[in-house]
C-alpha cells in the first residue's frame, strides 16, 4: 500500500498523522510522493475555523478529479471535520471511500489498511518514527471547557488523559530513536490528570528521561495554569522558557461571552508571575477579533493589551461562527470589513513588537538545537522558540550549536555557526 497524507489544522493533527505514518511503516506500507504514486490519499481535517473546512473541500475537489481518471485510488477523510460532518461529506463527494472521525482516530490505521486486505490484526505495531529530532506526543484528548466559539468539545469529545506510564515510555522510545526535544500536546495540557499524576508531575517524570534535552508543551488555558507549572518552568532546565497562552480578548465582557472563565486582570497576573519566575520566557498567544458584540472599545482594550504585554508572537483570527457552538446562536454583528481591519491592526502591532524583540538579538551568540538541514541550510531553534537559520553540515543535526546572529526578521533569525 502506498499512502499520501495531507494534514490540515493544529499540531495534534500533525501528531495524529505521524501516528498513522508509524503504523503504516511498521506494516511495510510506503509513503507516496504525489497522487500518481498513491493507492490511498488520506485527508486529516480541522473544524476549528470555516477556512480550514473550505481548504479541505478544495483539496477533496482536486482529488475527486484525479480519481475520475484513476478510479482505483482510495480517498479517506479523517479528523475533526470528518467527526462533525460524517456522512454529509459523502453526499458532497461520493468519491470518498472512508470517513473516520476524531473520536475514532486510534482505529484509523487498521480501518484504512483493511480497505486493501484484512490480515493486519495479528501483527505487532511499532509506533516509532526514527530520526526526527523534535517529536510530538499527545498526552490527552478532548476538552471540557466549552468556549462559546469552539467546536473542539463536539468533535474531539470530553477530556481523557492518557496513562502517564504510557506517555513516558513512548517518550523514552522516541529519545532512543534520536529525538532530543519532546512537545507534549493537548487541547488544554494544564488539565492533564491521570490518577494522582497532574501535568506538573508528568513533566517531572518526562524530564527524568536520559538524553532528552528539551521539553515544550501546548496548549495552555489561563484558568488552569498553576503555580506548580510555573515553578517547574523556573527550576527544571529541560523545560524550555516558552509558553503559548491564548488570551483571545482583553475585554472582560467579551471574555465572559466567550465563556473563557477568567478576567484580563487574571491573565495579566499570570504573565507577571511567569516573567518574574522565568525572566527569559517567551509568551505567545491567540487573539480573536470581531467576536459577536465586540465594540470599538472592546477591541481597543485588546490592542492595548498587545502593546502592554509585548508577546513574543501571536496568531490573530477573524471570528467565524462554528455550527453547534453557543456563539453561533449570537448575532454576528461585526461587519466582515471591520473584522479584516481589526485583524490587520493587531497583526501590524504584533509584527512591530516582534521585530523590536528579535532586533535586540542582533550581534549576540545564541545556543540552538539543530533540527534539520535542507540545501546546506540548517534550521534550528533557540530554547525560547525562535527559529534560526545558518549554513552548516548534516553532522550538526541533533546537536546544540552556537550561532552568531547577523540578521533578524519577524519570525526568524539568520547567522553564522561559531
From Swiss-Prot:
Report the superkingdom from the record: Bacteria
Q: Which PROSITE patterns match?
A: MTTASE_N (PS51449), MTTASE_RADICAL (PS01278), RADICAL_SAM (PS51918), TRAM (PS50926)
Query: What is the catalytic activity of this protein?
Result: N(6)-dimethylallyladenosine(37) in tRNA + (sulfur carrier)-SH + AH2 + 2 S-adenosyl-L-methionine = 2-methylsulfanyl-N(6)-dimethylallyladenosine(37) in tRNA + (sulfur carrier)-H + 5'-deoxyadenosine + L-methionine + A + S-adenosyl-L-homocysteine + 2 H(+)
Kindly list the cofactors needed.
Answer: [4Fe-4S] cluster
Q: Where in the cell is it found?
A: Cytoplasm
* Function as written in the Swiss-Prot or TrEMBL entry: Catalyzes the methylthiolation of N6-(dimethylallyl)adenosine (i(6)A), leading to the formation of 2-methylthio-N6-(dimethylallyl)adenosine (ms(2)i(6)A) at position 37 in tRNAs that read codons beginning with uridine.
Fill in the subunit field for this protein: Monomer.
Quick check: keyword Transferase in the entry? Answer: yes
Domain annotation Radical SAM core: ranges: 129-356
Q: What class of enzyme is it?
A: transferase
Cell inner membrane listed as a keyword: no
Question: Which residues hold [4Fe-4S] cluster 2?
Answer: 143, 147, 150
Name it. tRNA-2-methylthio-N(6)-dimethylallyladenosine synthase
Q: Which residues form the MTTase N-terminal domain?
A: 1-118
Cofactor comment: Binds 2 [4Fe-4S] clusters. One cluster is coordinated with 3 cysteines and an exchangeable S-adenosyl-L-methionine.
Span of domain TRAM: 359-418
EC number(s)?
Answer: 2.8.4.3
GO cellular component terms, A-Z: cytosol
Task: Return the similarity comment.
Answer: Belongs to the methylthiotransferase family. MiaB subfamily.
Q: Name one GO molecular function term.
A: 4 iron, 4 sulfur cluster binding
Q: Which UniProt keywords apply?
A: 4Fe-4S, Cytoplasm, Iron, Iron-sulfur, Metal-binding, S-adenosyl-L-methionine, Transferase, tRNA processing
Q: Which residues of this UniProt protein bind [4Fe-4S] cluster 1?
A: 10, 46, 80
Major location (coarse): cytoplasm
NCBIfam families xref list: miaB-methiolase (TIGR01574), MiaB/RimO family radical SAM methylthiotransferase (TIGR00089)
Amino acid at each position: 500500500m502506498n499512502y499520501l497524507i495531507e494534514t490540515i489544522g493544529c499540531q495534534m493533527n500533525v501528531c495524529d498523522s505521524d501516528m498513522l505514518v508509524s503504523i503504516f511503516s511498521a506494516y511495510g506500507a510506503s509513503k507516496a510522493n504525489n497522487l500518481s504514486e498513491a493507492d490511498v490519499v488520506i485527508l486529516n481535517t480541522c473544524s476549528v475555523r470555516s477556512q480550514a473546512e473550505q481548504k479541505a473541500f478544495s483539496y477533496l475537489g482536486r482529488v475527486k478529479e484525479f480519481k475520475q481518471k484513476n478510479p482505483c485510488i482510495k480517498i479517506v477523510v479523517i479528523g475533526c471535520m470528518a467527526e462533525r460532518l460524517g456522512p454529509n461529506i459523502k453526499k458532497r463527494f461520493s468519491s470518498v471511500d472512508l470517513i473516520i472521525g476524531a473520536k475514532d482516530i486510534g482505529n484509523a490505521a487498521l480501518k484504512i489498511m483493511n480497505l486493501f486486505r484484512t490480515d493486519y490484526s495479528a501483527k505487532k505495531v511499532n509506533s516509532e518514527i526514527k530520526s526526527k529530532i523534535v517529536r510530538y506526543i499527545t498526552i490527552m484528548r478532548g476538552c471540557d471547557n466549552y468556549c462559546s466559539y469552539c467546536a473542539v468539545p463536539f468533535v474531539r469529545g470530553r477530556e481523557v488523559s492518557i496513562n502517564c506510564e504510557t506517555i513516558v515510555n513512548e517518550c523514552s522510545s522516541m529519545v532512543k530513536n534520536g529525538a532530543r526535544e519532546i512537545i507534549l500536546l493537548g487541547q488544554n495540557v494544564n488539565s492533564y490528570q491521570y490518577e494522582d499524576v497532574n501535568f506538573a508531575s508528568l513533566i517531572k517524570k518526562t524530564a527524568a528521561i536520559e538524553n532528552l534535552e528539551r521539553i515544550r508543551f501546548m496548549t495552555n488555558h489561563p484558568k488552569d495554569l498553576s503555580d506548580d507549572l510555573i515553578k517547574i518552568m523556573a527550576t527544571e532546565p529541560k523545560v524550555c522558557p516558552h509558553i503559548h497562552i491564548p488570551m483571545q480578548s482583553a475585554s472582560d465582557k467579551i471574555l465572559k461571552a466567550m465563556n473563557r472563565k477568567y478576567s484580563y486582570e487574571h491573565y495579566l497576573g499570570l504573565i507577571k508571575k511567569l516573567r518574574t519566575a522565568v525572566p527569559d520566557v517567551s509568551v505567545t498567544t491567540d487573539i480573536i477579533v470581531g467576536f459577536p458584540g465586540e465594540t470599538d472599545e472592546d477591541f481597543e482594550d485588546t490592542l492595548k493589551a498587545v502593546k502592554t504585554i509585548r508577546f513574543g508572537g501571536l496568531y490573530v483570527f477573524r471570528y467565524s461562527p462554528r455550527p453547534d457552538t453557543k456563539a453561533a446562536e449570537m448575532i454576528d454583528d461585526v461587519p466582515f470589513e471591520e473584522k479584516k481591519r481589526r485583524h490587520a491592526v493587531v497583526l501590524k502591532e504584533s509584527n512591530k513588537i516582534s521585530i523590536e524583540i528579535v532586533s535586540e538579538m542582533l550581534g549576540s551568540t545564541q545556543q540552538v538545537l539543530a533540527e534539520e538541514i535542507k540545501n546546506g541550510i540548517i534550521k534550528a531553534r533557540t530554547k525560547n522558540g525562535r527559529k534560526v537559520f545558518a549554513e552548516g553540515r548534516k553532522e550538526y543535526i541533533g546537536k546544540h550549536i552556537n550561532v552568531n546572529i547577523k540578521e533578524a526578521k519577524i519570525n526568524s533569525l539568520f547567522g553564522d555557526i561559531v
